[in-house]
């Protein structure tokens, strides 16, 4: 099975999103290495009881992978919504 082409719509956004992920997951209580923020998925997987390992994880179910990705992505989305609401409230009525 081919791997998806995972590119952000905005060129160069990758580093900023990785920093954002690290910041959000640190606030959630996870130990995040700033040089390897993507590795937080292993800590999340361990907490959820998902046997995620570096390398091939073809033995994992979609549900298991979704639990890990959902925990990380959901936390990021909640923080983006919170930031947007904060910016809108600071802007005031138009």
Question: How does the language model describe each region?
Answer:
Residues 1-94:
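A charge-rich, low-complexity, intrinsically flexible signal that marks solvent-exposed coils, linkers
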